[in-house]
Amino acid sequence: YAYRDSIFKKPDARRRYIIHAVDYELSPISGPNLSYPALQKIFEGRDRSSITPTEIRNAIIATRSSKLPNPATVPSAGSFFKNPVISEECFNAIVAGNPGISVPNFRVEGGYKIPAAWLIDQCGWKGYGEGNVAVWHLQPLVIVNPERKASPDEVISLENKIIVSVREKFGITLTPEVEHI
C-alpha cells in the first residue's frame, strides 16, 4: 500500500475484488503526520508533541469541508484525476511557459509531481458547468453532479474535455483516479 494506491488498483486485481470491510492497526507511539501544507499552516509554531489526534482530525475535516462539496447535498466522485509525475524536462518547459507564475510541485522519484487541480485550474475549468455536470468552484479536481441528473456520458464527456485541454496546454495527459464501472 502507498498513498492513494494499493494492489486493488492493479490490472490483475481491478474488478476482481470488492472491499467490504477494513481493519486498521494504528500505532500508539507514532507522532502526527503534518506533511500536508494546510496542516503545517494550521499547526505552525506548535510543539508537535502537544498536538492531539482529535485536533488533527478536526483540522483535516475543516480543511476538506472548506474545499470539497458536501456529499449529502452535492454528489461527486471525489478527487477525479491523479496528480501526474512528469520529467524534469517537462517541468522546466511548464515553468518557462508560465513566467511569473509559481508552478506547485513536489520532487518525487522520477521527476516532479504536479497537482492535477492546478493544471485543470490553469486551463480555466474551475467552476465550469455543462449540462448536468460541473467542475467544483472551490476545487477543480472534483467533478460534481449538483442536480443529481447527470448521466455517465455527461461525466465522461467533461472528463475527456478536461484531459484534452490539459494535454494541449501542458503536454501532460491526466489519468482518472476514479474507477469507471
Regions found by a protein language model. Give the residues of each.
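Phosphate/pyrophosphate- and phosphate-bearing ligand-binding catalytic cores of soluble enzymes
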Residues: 1-153, 169, 173-181
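Phosphate/pyrophosphate-binding loops and the adjoining catalytic core of nucleotide-dependent enzymes
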Residues: 162
